[in-house]
Structure formats: C-alpha cells, structure tokens
Amino acid sequence: MKQYKTVNNLIGWITFIIAATVYCMTIEPTASFWDCPEFITTGYKLEVGHPPGAPFFMLVANLFSQFASDASTVAKMVNYMSALMSGACILFLFWSITHLVRKLVITDENNITKGQLITVMGSGLVGALAYLSLIHISEPTRLQLIS
C-alpha cells in the first residue's frame, strides 16, 4: 500500500506539471474576449463579480496580481494563476480517477500486483490528460460554431 501511495502521489504531481506547463505555455498575455477582462479586473481591484465561484477566484487572483511589476502585467499574472489552478484541477481529477479505479480493480489492498498498479495509474493518467486535451479542443470548436 505504501508503494501505491508513493507512485500515486508521484504520477499525480507529474500530471500537474504537464498540465500546468501546457496551460502556462498557452496563456493570453493580456485580457481577451468574453468574461476574462471582468475576472481580471475584479481580482485586481477586489470588486463585485457575477459568477458564483468568484470570491475564491478573486482572492487568489488578487494574491497573484500582487506579483505584477506594474498594472500592464496584471492580466498576465492572473492568467498564470488561472493556468496553475487549472493544472491543480487536473491533479485532483487524476487522484479522483485513481481512487475510483482502485476501488474497482484492487480486491486486496495489501497485495497489489504490478499489473493492477499499472492499470490504476494508466486509467488516471489517460482520464486526466484526456480532460486536459478536451479543454483545448472544445474552446476553438465552440468559437468556430459561434462565428
């Protein structure tokens, strides 16, 4: 079981690094269309925003905006924050998938075979990284359908 926890944590954090790197490489350096400028402004100035999850987002965005050298780089810092938080979402998705698959595949928690370990980790990795790629595919497709 200790080996499972070590491998699960290690692969989970590697998944986070992969996701956060991809998201950070593709951030917008300034404000873009839709609701992004509103989120950046409400996070920077701590003003009232309309989405339900806004208070947590605004507080974390304000924390990251404190690292901006001047007002022109606030948008980039908030976009980096969003990329890192999205990477954390992929991390927790990986851990959720491996937890569920472990309950389905492994019958004896004290005797985990290498095949079972590979099955559980592979399921989590495929599920988390498939979600990562779906986000990048769905947004351009949605924009193409609107225009």
Which sequence ranges carry the predicted segments?
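Single conserved hydrophobic/aromatic residue that forms the stacking wall/gate
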Residues: 135-147
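Juxtamembrane segments of multi-pass membrane glycosylation machinery
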Residues: 46-52, 60-84, 103, 134-135
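Extracytoplasmic catalytic/substrate-binding loops of multi-pass membrane glycan-assembly enzymes
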Residues: 27-39, 49-61
